[in-house]
Design a protein with these regions (language model features):
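Short, Lys/Arg-rich, polar N-terminal cytosolic tail immediately upstream
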Residues: 1-14
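Short, amphipathic, aromatic/basic-enriched membrane-interface segments that mark the entry/exit
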Residues: 12-20, 73-81, 100-107, 121-129, ...
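Membrane-water interface at transmembrane helix exits
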Residues: 30-37, 60-67, 96-97, 119-123, ...
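Membrane-embedded catalytic cores of phosphoryl/pyrophosphoryl-handling enzymes
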Residues: 105-196
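The first (N-terminal) embedded transmembrane alpha-helix
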Residues: 16-36
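Core segments of transmembrane alpha-helices
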Residues: 25-27, 83-95, 113-115, 133-137, ...
């Protein structure tokens, strides 16, 4: 029975990680900013969701359909996800300035790029920073600043996210904390660059 409970724990942890993947949180963030506050007007919301949500998700499809990548497991899955994510973040920042969009939109997109570069830099030095925690924390912090402080309650969602990551052995507590604070630092930096 203990083994069965363990299997249920693993299944629950995997489900939590799937439901809270960063691209889903990014899409929710953009939609809330669009429909509650009117940011990302017109087609900007669609394009930004494509850059921040759809493009990063494509990495998992590429990993799945290319046997050589799939055979190597998470050794290739994580770097591929980071690469596709950073590409999407670069495109979103470029779009913000070409369009051009306002300060809040620039803060949002530049924070994603900042966070992606920090995660990539950490990986280059063999330091793991939880992209999952980062992808949860960033939207919560941004929405609490620019929509309503009630969104700070969203940080309670990090409890099951932390549990699932620890249960599956994906991250250590320090890696999860590093991932959580990275986008907050990014938002603060971007707010100095793009005053609201």
């Amino acid at each position: 029975m203990v083994f069965a409970g363990g299997e249920r724990d693993v299944a629950s942890a995997k489900t939590i990680r799937i439901l809270t993947i960063p691209p889903v949180m990014a899409a929710i963030e953009i939609l809330v900013l669009r429909f509650v506050k009117g940011y990302f007007p017109g087609a900007a919301a669609i394009w930004t969701i494509f850059f921040l949500s759809i493009l990063p998700t494509v990495s998992y499809l590429v990993w799945w359909v290319v046997p050589a990548l799939r055979r190597r497991g998470r050794k290739t899955q994580r770097p591929l996800a980071v690469a596709f994510s950073v590409l999407g973040y670069v495109l979103s920042v470029g779009y913000c300035f070409v369009r051009p969009l306002g300060s809040v939109e620039r803060i949002a997109c530049c924070t994603y790029l900042f966070s992606g570069l920090v995660i990539a830099l950490c990986a280059a030095f063999r330091i793991k920073c939880s992209g999952h925690a980062c992808g949860m924390s960033g939207p919560i912090a941004l929405l609490s600043l620019f929509v309503s402080p009630w969104f700070l309650l969203g940080y309670l969602l990090l409890i099951p996210v932390f549990w699932s990551s620890l249960r599956l052995g994906r991250h250590t507590p320090s890696e999860l904390v590093l991932g959580t604070v990275t986008p907050v630092a990014g938002i603060l930096c971007m707010m100095m660059l793009f005053p609201v």
